[in-house]
UniProtKB/Swiss-Prot annotation:
Organism, scientific name: Shigella boydii serotype 18 (strain CDC 3083-94 / BS512)
Residues bound to ATP: 8, 11, 91, 137, 140
Gene it is expressed from: cca
Free-text cofactor note: Magnesium is required for nucleotidyltransferase activity. Nickel for phosphatase activity.
TM region positions: none
Required cofactor names: Mg(2+); Ni(2+)
Binding site for Mg(2+): 21, 23
Keyword Magnesium tagged: yes
Amino-acid positions noted as binding CTP in the UniProt annotation, renumbered to this chain: 8, 11, 91, 137, 140
Protein name: Multifunctional CCA protein
Amino acid sequence: MKIYLVGGAVRDALLGLPVKDRDWVVVGSTPQEMLDAGYQQVGRDFPVFLHPQTHEEYALARTERKSGSGYTGFTCYAAPDVTLEDDLKRRDLTINALAQDDNGEIIDPYNGLGDLQNRLLRHVSPAFGEDPLRVLRVARFAARYAHLGFRIADETLTLMREMTHAGELEHLTPERVWKETESALTTRNPQVFFQVLRDCGALRVLFPEIDALFGVPAPARWHPEIDTGIHTLMTLSMAAMLSPQVDVRFATLCHDLGKGLTPPELWPRHHGHGPAGVKLVEQLCQRLRVPNEIRDLARLVAEFHDLIHTFPMLNPKTIVKLFDSIDAWRKPQRVEQLALTSEADVRGRTGFESADYPQGRWLREAWEVAQSVPTKAVVEAGFKGVEIREELTRRRIAAVASWKEQRCPKPD
């Protein structure tokens, strides 16, 4: 029996990145030997075991053979005669097909070290094309390592295009698509994930609402980048700089979906695109089974982001009504989230990357003023039932009006 550290732990250590999870491959053993040694079996479809002390995963070396459609259609073969090289060959990318023995020596049968040095994401073998989930995984790796200068090898991108055009991605379940997307949204450069999907044709298949934005022009005066698809990726990039929250990043990605519905004869203007985009947000989220909290914020951002841009022109009643509409009294975090997504929208434009966004500050200040109005004082004043809410709203409007007079500049 020989045991090797494999995959991401080896890769990230070589890149000088923190190693989060360690996976091991066991060569020359059997399930019974693992059980006799005190390991606990957890793999149903193939032999994976938990170490009795560290609880890290130890998998018997195995090969996989395509036996059906999609990413689940594989037959696994694990036996003592399966070599380390056999096991590494089934992996997706060469940089993930590295192993390390107990002496610290790197085993690299597929030139993963060379590709690490050259910052290349390259598939190990043609078997890559048998698993459609790998298209999303490579896009996610491209996003995760973009800051290190990684790019996808030309032949790998070509294979990803062929897989997409062959209809392989249609076998992916919504849950797996969302899981990979959610993971990509946590990276430093989530926009790269969607750009890669567009480059291989997968964006049209998995995110048609976003793909439809490319080629849709916006007024050059406000959008020097002109193309709404490009603007969308720029705003996502900016959102990633402003917030680590997946909710904020996903909502920013979806903020302009309504522009994809504008008839070409009305271009480059997109009046009412915010509310129009709400249905597309709901459609996308329902299809991918996006969690409700993330969906709800994306709907609100689509509907109200343009309203925040015009904050100095809003009357106090409209401002308080906005807080009602986003349910800020019960979910106060939405004020900050709306401020961040709106700021990302403004700064996600060519030449505006460092722009100030006072509207975000005014929104936050107005919220502090509105929520500081005490409910207790309204009750103690003798108001009852529905009168309490009406009086509370009146006092909030008055407080915001007083603040706005002093702090918020009047529109020209």
